[in-house]
């Protein structure tokens, strides 16, 4: 059995990244694909579940895990720590399961420096106007927060060229097909196929 592939997925807020990942996983069995669940020191919000939305831990324990090198990447945001478990990702990949990591460009750089074999995908909105419309339609943020997110979006988008693949999420169904095509193509690469079908290849090449 071959290793799974780590997919780094980034996008400005409102581009549809989380929806695309969720739709992809809904159509595929969990033994083939999983989303990485980050550790965090922030409090649990209503409706959240430990181990589903985040692994909620105390700050002291998080700092202890940093010291042990347990995280592929971590960051402090508004006084709370967030980190990606190295052990969980490596164990999951070793089972032949693809892992999707929803992360910003800074975290993506940290991951790529340690796991250069990871594949990266950037999701773009078709326009600034459409991005702002989507943020307003969600009804989750105030005008001030939306203005802040739009400012952050320009910075995030400026790093699209650091990624292996770029998907334009204009039509959701088309973007999802593009997402699936990337995964399919990666699974058909020679090294993946050779590992998956080693016995068959040996038989084909036998005298």
UniProtKB/Swiss-Prot annotation:
Guanylate kinase-like domain location: 4-184
An annotated GO cellular component: cytosol
Residues involved in ATP binding: 11-18
Catalytic activity: GMP + ATP = GDP + ADP; dZMP + ATP = dZDP + ADP
Keyword Transferase: yes
InterPro entries: GK/Ca_channel_bsu, Guanylate_kin-like_dom, Guanylate_kinase, Guanylate_kinase_CS, P-loop_NTPase
Keyword annotations of the record: ATP-binding, Cytoplasm, Kinase, Nucleotide-binding, Transferase
EC number: 2.7.4.8
Involved pathway(s): Purine metabolism
One Gene Ontology molecular-function label: ATP binding
PROSITE patterns: GUANYLATE_KINASE_1, GUANYLATE_KINASE_2
SUPFAM superfamilies in the cross-refs: P-loop containing nucleoside triphosphate hydrolases (SSF52540)
Compartments where found: Cytoplasm
Source organism superkingdom: Bacteria
Pfam families attached to this UniProt entry: Guanylate_kin
Family: Belongs to the guanylate kinase family.
Protein task: Essential for recycling GMP and indirectly, cGMP. (Microbial infection) Catalyzes the phosphorylation of dZMP to dZDP, when the bacterium is infected by a phage that produces the substrate for the synthesis of dZTP (2- amino-2'-deoxyadenosine 5'-triphosphate), which is then used by the phage as a DNA polymerase substrate.
Name of the molecule in the record: Guanylate kinase
